[in-house]
Amino acid sequence: MFSGSGAIGLEAASRGAKEVHLIDKSAQTFPILKQNIDNLGFADFCFCYNSDSYSVIKSEKIKSKSFDIIFIDPPYCKEMIPEVIKIVSENNMLSDDGIIVTKIDSIEEVYEGYQNIELIKKKKYGN
């Protein structure tokens, strides 16, 4: 979620992910994301959505899926991660052995989890 040009998701695709869903609402970066998918020949299993991440993960098409890895990379200092994790948890979108990887600014509070999703490890890089 909050995919930008798709670098993280496309790296997962290049390493064997069977299906990748990339969400970004930016009118500036979405065409780049789409072009990157096409350039890499991943259009058959990489699906991109030019919309608000919350709306997409609440949609019937997505919320019925179970994911092994979910990357959440929202704009810094927006406190968006708790709501995303709540939606993922309430819709059982994370597989039993799945993981969520998030990235936040160092001034943001680390989110400890929600219901069946809990923080296992945190690392600090940079500021």
Spell out what each predicted region is:
Residues 1-127:
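Class I S-adenosyl-L-methionine-dependent methyltransferase catalytic core
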